[in-house]
Amino acid sequence: MEFLVNGASVYDESGVMVSFEESEDNIIENFRSDDLLRELIRENRIFIEDFSSTNGFESGDYSLEALFMRLDDAIKRVGAKRIVLDKVDNLFSHFEKKAIIRSELLQLIEWLNSRGLTSVFTTGENPYGGAAHGLEEYVSDCVIHLKHRYKDHIGTRYMTIKKYRGSEHGLNEYPMLINSKGLSLFPITSLRLDYTVSRRIVSSGIPELDNILGGGFYQWSSVLISGTSGTGKTSFVAKFAYEACERGERCLLFANEEPADQIIRNMASVGIDLEKFSSHNLLIHSERPTTLGLEAHLTAMQDLVREFEPDHVIIDPISSLTEAGFGVKDLFVRFTDFLKNRKITSILTYLTEGGSPLTTTEIHLSSLIDTWVILQQVEKGGYYANILRVLKSRGLKHSKKPVEFKLTSKGIKILGGE
């Protein structure tokens, strides 16, 4: 349906939906969240031809002439350039001989092609994972396979291009998300390393930290702030977000463990008034990755980035993504590449478990990170002091000297910064 709706609304190509399973009323009801479909039907740019209750093709000498007559009328009615035949396997369900099915399919495709139509067929699946009759794939120029897989009781949809004549298409499985805004795909391979880099430096929001970093962070770079629980990781990224919004820049904060109101309340205790920008420039989106599954979660994040168009993206924390296990690094590489290609600075926090080395992450992110700031607590004279050090900052002359910092009601205070 998205093929038809976008065709009519974006490319000015009217279309026909031919349904061999669902009634017209059911189709419209199933897409009731999309008012655009109803509008396009009213404007005579999309027409639904309902064959769901037709049994005239199922007896006597089989002929497609009656089908062609109805299709021809529907095509002319809207001046269609696109056509979808939904559950076309139902049309041939009473045939057992594959030779007849193949012949009729070819006749149908040739008839549609002769009218200059781009046609999409959908079909069910046989027990072996192929198309229902096992022949649809052979007579089609492009074959797209959809599947639904479960891991740890969480379902994720995937799309695979099994065949596309004349095209160097991808061969991998592409995670797919369907929501009220349509269908979204998450790229299965990293984007090419040809994105534009910036030489502009943006402030961390803390002048003393900027001095340690050699001026701040490079715009459009990826920054990691890691540390054990209670070291102030969220406070550092919240301060960055506050100062970015003060400059009129847009900031999108993905909170994976806390609701937005709780973050705003907690940050107020360290002198960071995020509520000031909550109605503009700053968007805090709270959702646990386990709600959808990692692939679907990152796809939803990708969609929100496109919609909000931020200058900076914060993910707090990314360590919650590691619960997805195998493949998480590959998925995250794609997401960070997606941000860099859109010229977005990314600030990530990572919770280091007690006893784990401070200079490693469970998903081995070091190669993806341009600047890495480590926060830790060290026993000092009967109390625990918060210590900050910069592990690396590519392209900037930074200090590696550890410095102490404090979280106060007036903000983050770095002691002895250069």
Which residues make up each language-model segment?
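The Walker A/P-loop phosphate-binding site
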Residues: 1-29, 187-264, 268-270
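Short glycine-/polar-rich loops that comprise or flank the Walker A/P-loop
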Residues: 11-14, 43-44, 116-117, 139-142, ...
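Conserved nucleotide-binding/hydrolysis micro-motifs of P-loop NTPases
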Residues: 21-25, 33, 52-56, 89-91, ...
